């Protein structure tokens, strides 16, 4: 493991890469949502390790072999929430991030690659097609709640597609076949207590910010402020943990919830409509601890442009894998 060269391909802000940082030679990430003008969020954790938008940029920084590719290419096109918005499922085979991943595997021929995605991916891009496109690789598929890795989000289900060179099957197959917990899952109450030990301030949107949520009982269903929403959560809607809309099409607003103190937290998403048990909007520190990130994983915030950086940070923390999957990969690689 001492000489491993690891490349991120569409690995966002590096949840899979951070536990293996000393082996990482770069991250090719074409998606603009992960980039900022000076790449402040990336640099605060990875320093000068290349964080680029294309292969052409990457080869200006690094020329050499790649042993392992880690990826969390686009999965939103195959999600339930995406389907509810667009009424159609995406075509991951045509997605630029999946295409880039396959191109980099064919180019570098790594010993191992790991793709984190949504379970639906293999319905749209079957394993038989992966085997046909990458005939030199043998595959292992894991499809589990991330709680199986030790994260607390029981409802967050993820696909882990592992490919390794057939000639190295004896080395990788036994190691990556088993799932185990690298942390102990916790209820929301304990997670919130843990989050207070983090050094980052729990930045969140101002109480007077309006978000696309409404009180279904009102004739004029205008957007509510976070202050109004908190009051409703703790009074009229105190028995609800999903936001009621009570319409003919749906009873609750998709993806909008507040966590229960004595249950596991629900799935965090890049949206700003997820709430703590007391009805307050979730802050950056809450996202960190629920996604499993340690205190040493730093967050860049510029208080002079707080709204922008809260949004960027929420995407960095939630659009991609939980931290425990990266720890699981590291523990497995250490056995080889």
Where are these regions (language model features)?
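Extracellular structured ligand-interaction cores
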Residues: 3, 156-158, 263-265
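Residues at alpha-helix caps and immediate loop-helix transition turns in enzyme cores, especially N-
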Residues: 38, 125-127, 321
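Class I S-adenosyl-L-methionine
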Residues: 60-66, 75-260
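Core alpha/beta nucleotide-donor-binding catalytic domains of modification enzymes
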Residues: 2-109, 119-123
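Short loop/turn segments at secondary-structure transitions that flank enzyme active sites
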Residues: 15, 72-75, 165-169, 274, ...
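C-terminal target-recognition/interaction regions appended to catalytic cores
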Residues: 215-336
């Amino acid at each position: 493991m001492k000489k491993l060269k690891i490349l991120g391909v569409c690995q966002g802000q590096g949840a899979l890469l951070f536990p293996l940082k000393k082996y990482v030679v770069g991250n090719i990430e074409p998606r603009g949502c992960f980039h900022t003008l000076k790449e402040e969020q990336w640099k605060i954790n990875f320093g000068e390790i290349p964080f680029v938008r294309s292969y052409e940029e990457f080869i200006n920084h690094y020329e050499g072999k790649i042993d392992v590719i880690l990826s969390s290419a686009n999965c939103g096109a195959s999600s339930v929430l995406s389907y509810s918005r667009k009424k159609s499922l995406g075509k991951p085979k045509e997605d630029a991030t999946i295409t880039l991943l396959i191109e980099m595997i064919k180019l570098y021929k790594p010993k191992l690659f790991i793709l984190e995605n949504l379970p639906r991916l293999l319905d749209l891009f079957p394993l038989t097609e992966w085997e046909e496109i990458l005939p030199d690789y043998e595959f292992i598929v894991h499809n589990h709640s991330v709680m199986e890795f030790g994260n607390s989000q029981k409802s967050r289900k993820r696909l882990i597609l592992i490919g390794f060179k057939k000639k190295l099957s004896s080395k990788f197959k036994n190691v990556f076949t088993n799932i185990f917990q690298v942390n102990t899952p916790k209820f929301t109450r304990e997670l919130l207590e843990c989050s207070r030990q983090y050094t980052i301030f729990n930045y969140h949107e101002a109480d007077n910010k309006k978000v696309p949520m409404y009180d279904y009982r009102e004739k004029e269903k205008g957007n509510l402020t976070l202050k109004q929403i908190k009051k409703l959560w703790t009074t009229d809607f105190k028995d609800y943990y999903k936001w009621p809309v009570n319409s003919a099409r749906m009873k609750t607003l998709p993806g909008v919830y507040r966590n229960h103190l004595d249950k596991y937290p629900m799935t965090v998403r890049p949206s700003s409509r997820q709430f703590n048990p007391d009805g307050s909007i979730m802050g950056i520190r809450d996202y960190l601890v629920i996604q499993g990130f340690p205190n040493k994983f730093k967050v860049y915030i510029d208080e002079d442009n707080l709204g922008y950086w809260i949004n960027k940070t929420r995407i960095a923390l939630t659009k991609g894998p939980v931290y425990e999957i990266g720890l699981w990969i590291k523990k497995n690689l250490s056995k080889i």
